[in-house]
UniProtKB/Swiss-Prot annotation:
The lineage of its organism: Eukaryota, Metazoa, Chordata, Craniata, Vertebrata. This is Platelet-derived growth factor receptor beta. Residues 1062-1082 have a biased composition (Low complexity). Its EC number is 2.7.10.1. PANTHER family: PLATELET-DERIVED GROWTH FACTOR RECEPTOR BETA, TYROSINE-PROTEIN KINASE RECEPTOR.
Length: 1098
């Protein structure tokens, strides 16, 4: 088939003639029609085929990018046709043919018809391809087509990667080829013609990373004046290779502008095309379009912008203000004018023809800003408007081409206020009331009256007054405008002809800003005397009510007695939030109840702000002793109900904890028929601080010899040779020690016992039947009739005693920690000394005047021992057994300073709190060894989780004591558990199945969580599981003292043990002499041992 490159002139002239005829002839709406019809045809090789396409306008045939040979004609019915004749066809004629309207000769019609022709050619399996079509570029993961087109639609075609025989499963279309998603590889198509395999050309697929096109178009100015320049930028982000094409108004006149390409390297990269017209003309107004395309995938985008070229600049108002603008006094007011202008104008604000400027004090603010390219807003902000700012304002906006101005009046509205309301009594008997007020706008005056003075302001509407026809009242009003103040003043005078009873008259002024009123009571000329009396009574009542309120507030702020001991119920997962047992909800066991007639109160051992501790004699507490000296805790008669509840809570906690050798044990209680009494053990030598102060001289005298180190100290039951007691040291039972009187006030009001029991009176307590072992050093002491086991019966205070005190306190606190009990006030003042230097932990804050005690600091309605408290307790109110460990470290410092006051160098103010936060710790005491001070430092760790538990402190202190001391302590502890001590007996009555054997505590465990309840011990607050006897026996190391616990022995003995009575054994075999006397070394500077050698604590 011949496809000439140039159409002959005759044919061209025919087409022009047909076009003219079409323009002059009738129009039809008929579409394109191909004859013969069909989507595809299969032709025999070397055959001839004719296709005719007709339409309502000149039409033509297209094959791909070529124009095949065709003949155009105009039919008689007014339609146009084109005949395509294919002669001697070959396989190369296979392809698609399009019939389209000839756009260059007719209207722009976009309709087109397609037909596909196959010419099977055995010599040509695949259609030949141009070399550029063998390279296929794809972007991202989009589908593409490998154009393996064949001449015969009956052939089966497969796609392979080159050099791989396995075909790929990709959809195939005989007219298009394989369509799918391909990787960056080389592909080949295969088919079979007869018995011959035919391969296509090799296709190369390449993936290109082409990001999406992001086009932005902006102009320096979209509005320009004639003669100014136009500059438009078209910017593409993130693409490296793009094509720019501009469309602009000058193109119509053939005046082209060469754009400039600008490369801006960076992340991301930018490419820009700049279209610049240096001198704008009015004809340059219009739309400027920037079309950007990517040559790889023909993807593109375009943006347009409108440019207006004006002959001259302009200024036009868009939003104006009214002729009168209102501002309210002392409120900010913004006056805003919106206008449109080009170029940007200058703006001035004037008040009363004087130019305004920004106020340095911020009272006036001027601003003009762009809302858009040619739209502006100018604002005048008056901050807290004043009356002087009222007046006439003008806003001027101008430039060299145009000017506009706006004028208005600013009125400042002032709230109305009554300045004066006065009453006068002229001589003619009239009542004259004058009301003067001011405001802007002009206020209106309203007078009203009410005769029921009690109900008038609340329930009755006043009756309006005015000029009465009966001439009972006359009203006169004058209005004046003050130009300087820019407000109106109203003066209204009301004249009442006759007033026969008290009358309430109200003057009310009102305007748009609100109203104000005042009232005056008009009375007859003779004022009744009862008004004066009533006023005085009311004033007195008000003063009385205020005084009562003040007294109630002071009473509520008065400190209350609070129990310091708390029992932990549960702990949060992070270990920083604790829930404590509410002791109010605990039951009280009546087995602890002691009849009041079996208790005889004696002298006061200590008294405080909330209560007192009294020495007493109890009858019938034990089987072996008819009477027993005890200590009784009680509240004052003025105690509040909350304080009584606190004391009852303390009783419940003590009754549930159980007995222990180093805790002041509960012996009984009186809760019925009178005030609450808590009966505890009596410790004759008072608290540890007072004990250390009283015996400090014996310690210092013993260690005054510098050649006698503490390690040479021996455990002795007798005085060293050559050591004599000072003459002023009295060791009798009644005067040696005793409770430290913690209150200087001896006149304590006791609750009369006669009110409860008529046959019981206060009596002096007789001296106990037992005498202190110290008495054997006093010539007048009677002969002792028995021998008791004591930890230490030496009257001399030794270093071993200090370590022993620390060891015993640690044992007692370990017992409380095992019960989840937090002490919260562990200090030397709350540790008592008993016979044989046995120490017991207590809480006698009830008997201490904490409001005058410098050791307690007021915080809210309570007093806190801040010097003994851990940082988490001071700053976060967190109390745990490990915060008690911190307090134990302070107690060690007290012991080894012989009763010193902690932090002597720090005042109790912000300096103390800042020092604790910075990690300040007290220095090593003079009498403390390095081992003791190391224990103190462990107790003072900043993070409470790293402090050692009391079980570990017991072991650390136990290592510093000799075997003799530990054995005697263990012996005393065992005798205590086997005795008929009242605490033991009553606990056995409540828990008959509890074994006396104590299981050693696991030193690695710290009490963080509450122990789960056990059914067999359901009376305990937080019960512990029953230990197995055989396991406990095996776990107890030989020679080590048993740790504290509340378990009891079922075996009762006939003897009774008291804190101050020597421990008597059931059957004590004949004892030999305690220890052989050791010879005193000659010429020794150190006192020699006289009895059993004291084990070194080092």
């Amino acid at each position: 088939m011949g496809l000439p490159g140039v159409i002959p002139a005759l044919v061209l002239r025919g087409q022009l003639l047909l076009s003219v005829l079409w323009l002059l002839g009738p129009q039809t709406s008929r579409g394109l029609v191909i004859t013969p019809p069909g989507p595809e045809f299969v032709l025999n090789i070397s055959s001839t085929f004719v296709l005719t396409c007709s339409g309502s306008a000149p039409v033509m045939w297209e094959q791909m990018s070529q124009v095949p040979w065709q003949e155009a004609a105009m039919n008689q019915d007014g339609t146009f046709s084109s005949v395509l004749t294919l002669t001697n066809v070959t396989g190369g004629d296979t392809g698609e043919y399009f019939c389209v309207y000839n756009n260059s000769l007719g209207p722009e019609l976009s309709e087109r018809k397609r037909i596909y022709i196959f010419v099977p050619d055995p010599t040509m399996g695949f259609l030949p391809m141009d070399s550029e079509d063998l390279f296929i570029f794809v972007t991202d993961v989009t589908e593409t087509t490998i154009p393996c087109r064949v001449t015969d639609p009956q052939l089966e075609v497969t796609l392979h990667e080159k050099k791989v025989d396995i075909p790929l499963h990709v959809p195939y279309d005989h007219q298009r080829g394989f369509t799918g998603t391909f990787e960056d590889k080389t592909y080949i198509c295969k088919t079979t013609i007869g018995d011959r395999e035919v391969d296509s050309d090799t296709y190369y697929v390449y993936s290109l990373q082409v990001s999406s096109i992001n086009v932005s178009v902006n102009a320096v100015q979209t509005v320009v004046r004639q003669g100014e320049s136009i500059t438009i930028r078209c910017i593409v982000m993130g693409n490296d290779v793009v094509n720019f094409q501009w469309t602009y108004p000058r193109m119509k006149s053939g005046r082209l502008v060469e754009p400039v390409t600008d490369y801006l390297f960076g992340v991301p990269s930018r490419i820009g095309s700049i279209l610049h017209i240096p001198t704008a003309e009015l004809s340059d107004s219009g739309t400027y379009t920037c079309n950007v395309s990517v040559s790889v995938n023909d993807h593109g985008d375009e943006k347009a912008i409108n440019i207006s070229v004006i002959e001259n600049g302009y200024v036009r108002l868009l939003e104006t203000l009214g002729d009168v603008e209102i501002a309210e006094l002392h409120r900010s007011r913004t006056l805003r004018v919106v206008f449109e202008a080009y170029p940007m104008p200058s703006v001035l604000w004037l008040k009363d023809n004087r130019t305004l400027g920004d106020s340095g004090a911020g009272e006036l603010v001027l601003s003009t800003r762009n809302m858009s390219e040619t739209r502006y807003v100018s604002e005048l902000i008056l901050v807290r408007v004043k009356v002087s700012e009222a007046g006439y304002y003008t806003m001027r906006a101008f430039h060299e081409d145009d000017e506009v101005q706006l004028s208005f009046k600013l009125q400042v509205n002032v709230p109305v206020r009554v300045l004066e309301l006065s009453e006068s009594h002229p001589a003619n008997g009239e009542q004259t009331i004058r009301c003067r007020g001011r405001g802007m706008p002009q206020p209106n005056v309203t007078w009203s009256t009410c005769r029921d003075l009690k109900r008038c302001p609340r329930k009755l509407s006043p009756t309006p007054l005015g000029n009465s026809s009966k001439e009972e009242s006359q009203l006169e009003t004058n209005v004046t405008f003050w130009e300087e103040d820019q407000e109106y003043e109203v003066v209204s005078t009301l004249r009442l002809r006759h007033v026969d009873q008290p009358l309430s008259v109200r003057c009310m002024l009102q305007n748009s800003m609100g109203g104000d009123s005042q009232e005056v009571t008009v009375v007859p000329h003779s004022l009744p005397f009862k008004v004066v009396v009533i006023s005085a009574i009311l004033a007195l009542v008000v003063l009385t009510v205020i005084s009562l309120i003040i007294l109630i507030m002071l009473w509520q702020k008065k400190p209350r007695y609070e129990i310091r001991w708390k029992v932990i119920e549960s702990v949060s997962s992070d270990g920083h939030e604790y829930i404590y047992v509410d002791p109010v909800q605990l039951p009280y066991d009546s087995t602890w109840e002691l009849p009041r007639d079996q208790l005889v109160l004696g002298r006061t051992l200590g008294s405080g702000a909330f209560g007192q501790v009294v020495e007493a004699t109890a009858h019938g507490l034990s089987h072996s002793q008819a009477t027993m000296k005890v200590a009784v805790k009680m509240l004052k008669s003025t105690a509040r109900s909350s304080e009584k509840q606190a004391l009852m809570s303390e009783l419940k906690i003590m009754s549930h904890l159980g007995p222990h050798l180093n805790v002041v044990n509960l012996l009984g209680a009186c809760t019925k028929g009178g005030p609450i009494y808590i009966i505890t053990e009596y410790c004759r030598y008072g608290d540890l601080v007072d004990y250390l102060h009283r015996n400090k001289h014996t310690f210092l005298q013993r260690h005054s010899n510098k050649h006698c180190p503490p390690s040479a100290e021996l455990y002795s039951n007798a005085l060293p040779v050559g050591f004599s007691l000072p003459s002023h040291l009295n060791l009798t039972g009644e005067s040696d020690g005793g409770y430290m009187d913690m209150s200087k006030d001896e006149s304590i009001d006791y609750v009369p016992m006669l009110d409860m029991k008529g046959d019981i009176k206060y009596a002096d307590i007789e001296s106990p039947s037992y005498m202190a072992p110290y008495d054997n050093y006093v010539p007048s002491a009677p002969e002792r009739t028995y021998r008791a086991t004591l930890i230490n019966d030496s009257p001399v205070l030794s270093y071993t005693d200090l370590v022993g005190f620390s060891y015993q306190v640690a044992n007692g606190m370990d017992f409380l920690a095992s019960k989840n009990c937090v002490h919260r006030d562990l200090a030397a003042r709350n540790v008592l000394i008993c016979e044989g230097k046995l120490v017991k932990i207590c809480d006698f804050g009830l008997a201490r005047d904490i409001m005058r005690d410098s050791n307690y600091i007021s915080k809210g309605s309570t007093f806190l021992p801040l010097k003994w408290m851990a940082p988490e307790s001071i700053f976060n109110s967190l109390y745990t057994t490990l915060s008690d460990v911190w307090s134990f470290g302070i107690l060690l410092w007290e012991i080894f300073t012989l009763g010193g006051t902690p932090y002597p160098e720090l005042p109790m103010n912000d300096q103390f709190y800042n020092a604790i936060k910075r990690g300040y710790r007290m220095a090593q005491p003079a009498h403390a060894s390095d081992e003791i001070y190391e224990i103190m430092q462990k107790c003072w760790e900043e993070k409470f989780e790293t402090r050692p538990p009391f079980s570990q402190l017991v072991l650390l202190l136990e290592r510093l004591l000799g075997e003799g001391y530990k054995k005697k302590y263990q012996q005393v502890d065992e005798e205590f558990l086997r005795s008929d001590h009242p605490a033991i007996l009553r606990s056995q009555a409540r828990f008959p199945g509890i074994h006396s054997l104590r299981s050693p505590l696991d030193t690695s465990s710290v009490l963080y969580t509450a122990v789960q309840p056990n059914e067999s011990d359901n009376d305990y607050i937080i019960p512990l599981p029953d230990p197995k006897p055989d396991v406990a026996d095996e776990g107890l190391p030989e020679g080590s003292p048993s740790l504290a616990s509340s378990t009891l022995n079922e075996v009762n003995t006939s003897s009774t043990i008291s804190c101050d009575s020597p421990l008597e054994l059931q059957e004590e075999p004949q004892q030999a002499e305690p220890e052989a006397q050791l010879e005193q070394p000659q010429d020794s500077g150190c006192p020699g041992p006289l009895a059993e050698a004291e084990d070194s604590f080092l």
